[in-house]
Regions:
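Solvent-exposed coil/turn segments that connect beta secondary-structure elements
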Residues: 79, 88, 169-172, 182-184, ...
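C-terminal outer-membrane beta-barrel translocator/porin domains of Gram-negative envelope proteins
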Residues: 397, 409-423, 448, 537-538, ...
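Hydrophobic h-region of N-terminal signal peptides that target proteins for export
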Residues: 9-18
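Acidic/histidine-enriched alpha-helical segments
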Residues: 238-240, 247, 309-325, 525, ...
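Gram-negative/organellar outer-membrane beta-barrel architecture
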Residues: 367, 372, 386-551, 558, ...
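Sec-dependent signal peptide recognition
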Residues: 2-9
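Patatin-like phospholipase
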Residues: 19-64, 72-385, 389-390, 405-406
Length: 728
């Protein structure tokens, strides 16, 4: 590994044995060993390109981590240009971050991520347990499955167009393991499984992680394969400056780097030719520098031309060599005659087989299959889903391996909420959502929410599908809540009320797809508004029972739960109150919220949101139903400064991505600007239109979005605020 990088970047540097019987060669055979190094490993493509241009044959190839990936792709018969095209088309940022895309989540998992936007979860399946890695490996696994699919039925990696090996670290025996057979995609995943970052690969009761820990430059493996002349490609990163200040994490990272560097020196000592690629100006996460890295590898090979050119073949010999390699390449994938799912319970496997039955007798389209399997992970049950071909009873079938989360259910989604719109009275709460699966029936869910701090809340819902193959469901639920209702005039807090309620209800609904849902329900219980501090005459102190029927429609086509860049969302609620404390009579109520986001350039987008609510002219509702004031509700105004029974609020804004955090810390950082204008009806100041402009930074952290900004509005309203938690 490389000096001068943090422990996280070091981990990326890890990214990258039996004697085989070689084919008969009238010449000295050549073996290539490729070192691990995260994005630095892309330089191997340049080395391969130079060697092919100069007719240097590669009879054997072995690699570790990223070297294993590049070597494995090349071993399937792709030429360096094809390898370059493949790796250049990978969304490395998405692969590294590892989260299932928001658009691919089921509707209920979209609700989870929207309401609990922290970027991590844990489980209680065997006590408190976290995932085996920051990244489940699903996205990278699909890439490897696609590469390896034509070679699924090979018995040995010796039968690939170029014989291949890759190195992994096996944890149960604490030793190096060399993959030479089995599913190629599993082997590539294992050699790249950075400890703590990617979830380990479990095969046949063994646990595999990145091979760079024990053998980052496997020249010994190439020798055992039968190579006469061994070429090692060493990725020379930046060295540690003795004057560089080190944190405890840096010391740990550099210590691991020293251990791995020892394996690299051992590998170089066993090579006949060493190609050392100068990559000091790059880092193990420099995936956006594909062309520069490839060029560096090419230049390093050129610098070693005097050692390499003696292995050059004549044009005739080279064409014969390519023809032999091409003859071992499998050009097409057999059409599967059945679909088989494993890794989960028989009942769940049966559902997945029915869901994927369309592939029975149909040619595999890897992109469409990848999309379907990603949507399966979006159900929340599986950490990763992969595929390969299997043979049974003389027929070729599509095997789907669904890896259930080892730590869940129940799944725990934590939340941390900070509202600093009044820096003298910061509101703070912590909580979590607990989701239990298959309670009483397959696919049934028990969802429990708890929150404590400035607000105390407990809620429970039992989601019961009426059929495994339709969207109809029933959902009994109950909630108890004790929340602050602080009332302001500009920056001055006039009063603090508590809104306490306890309700139970039943919904009947239909989930159309992963984007929208319709519910009909009835809810009844108790509601109280009680003043704690300040002016007790601002709103009525009421207490009593409430009951209402409701219709709710939700649509979510956004591309992100935290800071969307594209898509639309709509939430519409219609309630009819039979009773409510302080209300003179029964009355209807409706409120809606609409969002639209449109990207303009890769780092820029605009958005428009609209909200509105009405009681259709009924004023005797007890406490007014809606409030305006506070972040994203007229940000320059004090919290709940305006009470009303009818309003509208329009917002238009601009988002510009300023930078991007390392995956372990969060995601994007945006500069956000917006203009808000609204109208509240039925109050003395209703003739004017309250408005403001807001500017701030939105930072996507592991604990959810942090928003820091200020707003200036009409009539002298202005405010500085910060908050952590849901924004849009």
């Amino acid at each position: 590994m490389r000096r001068g990088i943090s422990v996280i970047l070091l981990c990326f540097a890890l990214f990258a044995g039996a004697q085989t019987t070689p084919a008969s060669h009238p010449r000295e055979t050549v073996g290539l060993a490729l070192e691990g190094g995260g994005a630095l490993g892309l330089a191997h493509i340049g080395v391969l390109q130079w060697m092919e241009e100069h007719h240097i044959p590669i009879d054997y190839v072995a690699g570790t981590s990223m070297g294993g990936l590049v070597g494995g792709i090349y071993a399937t018969g792709m030429n360096p240009g094809e390898v370059r095209e493949l790796v250049g088309g990978i969304d490395w940022d998405g692969v590294i971050r590892g989260q299932t895309d928001f658009r691919d989540l089921s509707f209920r998992r979209k609700e989870d991520r929207t309401e609990y936007p922290a970027a991590f979860e844990f489980g209680l399946r065997h006590g408190v347990a976290f995932p085996g890695g920051f990244n489940s490996g699903h996205q990278v696994g699909l890439i490897l499955d696609r590469i390896a699919l034509p070679y699924s039925l090979l018995k040995s990696f010796d039968d690939l167009p170029t014989p291949f090996r890759c190195v992994s670290t096996e944890l149960t025996e604490r030793e190096e393991f060399v993959f030479q057979q089995g599913p190629l995609s599993d082997a590539l995943r294992a050699t790249m499984s950075i400890p703590g970052f990617f979830t380990p690969v479990k095969l046949n009761h063994k646990i595999y992680v990145d091979g760079g820990l024990l053998d980052n430059l496997p020249t010994d493996v190439v020798k055992e394969m039968g190579a006469d002349h061994i070429i090692a490609v060493h990725l020379q990163g930046a060295k540690l400056n003795a004057e560089t200040p080190l944190s405890s994490f840096s010391v740990l990272g550099e210590s691991i780097a020293a251990v791995v560097a020892t394996t690299e020196r051992r590998g170089m000592a066993k090579a006949d030719t060493v190609i050392s690629v100068d990559l000091a100006r790059f880092g193990p996460t420099s995936f956006d520098a594909v062309d520069e890295l490839i060029a560096a590898g090419y230049a390093a090979a050129e610098a070693n031309a005097s050692a390499l050119l003696p292995k050059r073949l004549s044009d005739t010999e080279w064409n014969e060599f390519l023809a032999r390699r091409q003859s071992r390449r499998i050009p097409s994938v057999p059409t599967p005659q059945f679909v088989q799912v494993d890794g989960t319970s028989p009942a769940v496997a049966s559902q997945l087989e029915r869901r994927l039955k369309s592939w029975d007798g149909k040619r595999i389209d890897p992109r469409r299959l990848d999309q379907q399997l990603t949507e399966v992970t979006g159900l929340g049950r599986f950490s990763a889903v992969g595929y390969n071909l299997v043979e049974k009873d003389g027929k070729v079938g599509l095997r789907i391996h669904a890896a259930e989360k080892e730590y869940a259910p129940p799944t725990v989604n934590p939340t941390l909420i900070i509202n600093g719109s009044d820096y003298q009275n910061v509101l703070f709460a912590v909580g979590a959502r607990f989701t239990f699966l298959d309670i009483g029936k397959i696919n049934a869910e028990l969802r429990t929410d708890v929150l404590a701090g400035s607000e105390y809340r407990a809620a429970i819902e039992y989601y019961l599908p009426l059929s495994a193959y339709s969207g109809w469901f029933v959902a009994p639920r109950a909630v108890a809540d004790n929340a602050p209702l602080n009332i302001y005039l500009r920056d001055k807090r006039l009063a603090e009320y508590r809104q306490r309620e306890a309700n139970t209800g039943l919904d009947f609904g239909y989930t159309f797809n992963r984007f929208n849902e319709l519910r009909f329900g009835y809810e009844f219980g108790w509601l109280q508004y009680d003043p704690d501090l300040g002016d007790k005459s601002l709103i009525r102190a009421v207490s009593g029972k409430q009951s209402f029927s409701r219709v709710r429609y939700s649509l979510n086509h956004l591309d992100d739960a935290i800071v969307p860049r594209a898509g639309v969302a709509l939430n519409a609620n219609i309630n009819f109150y039979d009773s409510r404390p302080g209300a003179a009579d029964q009355f209807p109520e409706m409120d809606t919220h609409f969002q639209f986001f449109q990207p303009l350039r890769p780092n820029d987008s605009v958005f428009f949101t609209g909200s509105g609510g009405t009681t259709f002219g009924y004023s005797g509702t007890g406490v007014p139903m809606f409030t305006l004031g506070g972040p994203f509700r007229l940000s320059a105004y004090g919290n709940n400064e305006i009470f009303t029974n009818q309003y509208f609020l329009l917002q238009a804004g601009y988002l510009h991505q300023v930078t991007q955090l390392p995956p372990i810390l969060g995601n994007h950082v945006y500069l956000a600007g917006s203009y808000e204008i609204g109208k509240a009806y039925g109050i003395a100041r209703s003739q004017r239109l309250p408005m403001d402009g807001t500017l701030g930074l939105v930072i996507q952290t592991l604990f959810g979005p942090a928003y820091i900004g200020g707003s200036y509005g009409d009539s002298g309203h202005h405010k500085f605020f910060f908050q952590l938690g849901k924004i849009f």
